[in-house]
Amino acid sequence: MFTQGSFSSEVTGTTLTNMEVTVYDSISAVPVYGDPALQGSTLPRVIAVYSDDQTVRAAVSAALGKKLPGEEREHKVLDFATADALRQYLGDKRKVDLFILDGEAVPEGGLGLAHSLKDELIDCPPIMVIIQRAQDSWLAKWSGADAVTSHPIDPFTLGSKVAELLQ
């Protein structure tokens, strides 16, 4: 699947030697969806936030900050305004460690998207959905969501739930 060894390059006019690299021999070997080989890694975790409402995406990003409570490792928040953009990102075999999906998003709601992701992705990362009404918690359960939070975004609740999901 991959090989490790030394690497020399003169791309920038500088020769890099004795650099440890991992070379993947196929697209299927690219680390995706919380690859166990990356456990203990210092790479930032990737949190994908989906909502058609920019204020919701901004509130989630602000609540998460750069690091979660009790975490030394930073994370990277990626905003997606459409489900199609999120699917395209995933179709490019890019890594995601956690999804946060707005159940109130239109035209495709986060609950339906969560259900689709759980069905379509092998080893799907954890999914948190944001709901407007407590009565919608049964829909969140149906969707396969691993956690639920509600509007308006509470930074303390969101941060602690996300930290729990990423452990």
Predicted regions and their residues:
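Conserved acidic segment of CheY-like receiver
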Residues: 44-65, 99
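Conserved phosphotransfer microenvironments
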Residues: 61, 96-118
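Short hydrophobic/Thr-rich beta-strand motif most characteristic of the beta2 strand and flanking loop
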Residues: 71-81
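Acidic, metal-coordinating helix/loop segments flanking the phosphotransfer/catalytic sites
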Residues: 79-98
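Conserved phosphotransfer cores of two-component systems
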Residues: 91-94, 118-123
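A short, hydrophobic beta-strand element within the central beta-sheet of small alpha/beta folds
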Residues: 99, 124-135
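Alpha4 helix (beta4-alpha4-beta5 surface) of REC/receiver domains from two-component response regulators
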Residues: 132-149
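C-terminal output helix
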Residues: 153-162
